[in-house]
Each structure stands twice: as structure tokens, then as C-alpha cells.
């Protein structure tokens, strides 16, 4: 774990170049949260997005082809992106989840959608191959309702532009689709 204050924020051109360098080699993008405090960047993720929307790579080394351990059994050929925060979050029933003392911020949600748009556009990844950790965990049998003690529910629901809670993957893919024409 590193502190964002000790890392250099990435600009979107750096992310575009990393995506170009990985063109045709990425199968999936998985979206997470760190379940820790803002400002903490973990090496399991290729990119981390802090509360203010600034984007960081662990060790200031952005390589989207590097193998990182972010999603059980699905790390090869994939990119992991995490929002910092959601420390002490509680799933409850999904729409009524409590994001804890450090919830996803609007700046983080928009930055994540922009990063997804860049990776999809420049690395040649289909928007249909972008999943939240909750979505892929549900497919693989360790998502909400599975009874698994290691249940993953990252980004199960998020507030949309109208502040209504909606499935997080739908929110993020919808925003990313809009940004793809603008990045």
C-alpha cells in the first residue's frame, strides 16, 4: 500500500498511451473499491482513483499488461481499477447500502467512467467486457446472496445523475459509453 500524496497523479494522455500500448491484449476491465481510506493506493490494481478524481498507478508505473491480483481467477488479460475509500461500508440489501465514512464521490465516479472509456476506446475493449467486482463475483458464485464469507459487493449500487441508487455497473458503463465519443 502506498499513499497517494507520495505518488504522481496521472494525466489522461498517459492513460491513453498505456491503453494504446495494450491494444488487443486486454479481455476485461474489473471495477473495484479499496475498502480502505481515501488516499491509499494498492498494488493489486492497475489504477486507483482518489476522492478528488485524481488517478494513480502503484509505484508511478502504469503498465496495463502487468499481472495484478485484483479479481479472483480473472486476473490474466484484465485491468483492475479501484476507487479509494468505502472504509467500513455495509452492503445491507444493495440499494440501501451504507458506503461508510468515505463513500464514492461524484469526482471518483466520473473519473472511473472516463478511464473506462479511454481503455475501451484505445485498448480495443468492448464496453460489454467491463464489470464491477460485484457483477463478476455474482457470476462466479461469491457475490451478494451467495453466503460466501468473502462476498464481494464492490460497486453493487451507485447514485446516478439523479441521485437514485442504480446498479453500479450500469451507471459506470453508461457514463463510459457517453465519454467514449469525447476522449
Name each model-derived stretch.
Residues 1-23, 86-183:
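Basic/polar, cationic surfaces and motifs that engage anionic cell-wall
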Residues 28, 78-80, 129-131:
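Structural preference for beta-strand elements that scaffold enzyme active sites
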Residues 73-90:
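Short coil-to-beta-strand
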Residues 34, 48, 69, 76-78, ...:
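Generic serine detector
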Residues 42, 76, 107, 111:
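Short, well-structured alpha-helical interface segments that form or flank functional binding sites
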Residues 1-75:
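N-terminal catalytic cores of peptidoglycan-degrading enzymes
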Amino acid at each position: 500500500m502506498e499513499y497517494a500524496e507520495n505518488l504522481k497523479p496521472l494525466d489522461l494522455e498517459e492513460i491513453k498511451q498505456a491503453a494504446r500500448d495494450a491494444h488487443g491484449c486486454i479481455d476485461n476491465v474489473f471495477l473495484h473499491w479499496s475498502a480502505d481510506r481515501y488516499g491509499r493506493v494498492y498494488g493489486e490494481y492497475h489504477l486507483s482513483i482518489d476522492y478528488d478524481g485524481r488517478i494513480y498507478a502503484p509505484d508511478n508505473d502504469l503498465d496495463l499488461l502487468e499481472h495484478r491480483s485484483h479479481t479472483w481467477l480473472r486476473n490474466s488479460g484484465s485491468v483492475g481499477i479501484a476507487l479509494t475509500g468505502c472504509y467500513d461500508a455495509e452492503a445491507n440489501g444493495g440499494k440501501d447500502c451504507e458506503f461508510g465514512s468515505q463513500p464514492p464521490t461524484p469526482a471518483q465516479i466520473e473519473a472511473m467512467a472516463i478511464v473506462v472509456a479511454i481503455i475501451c476506446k484505445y485498448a480495443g475493449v468492448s464496453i460489454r467486457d467491463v464489470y464491477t467486482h460485484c457483477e463478476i463475483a455474482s457470476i462466479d458464485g461469491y457475490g451478494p446472496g451467495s453466503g460466501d464469507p468473502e462476498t464481494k459487493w464492490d460497486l453493487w449500487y451507485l447514485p446516478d445523475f439523479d441521485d437514485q441508487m442504480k446498479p453500479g455497473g450500469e451507471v459506470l458503463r453508461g457514463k463510459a459509453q457517453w465519454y467514449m465519443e469525447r476522449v
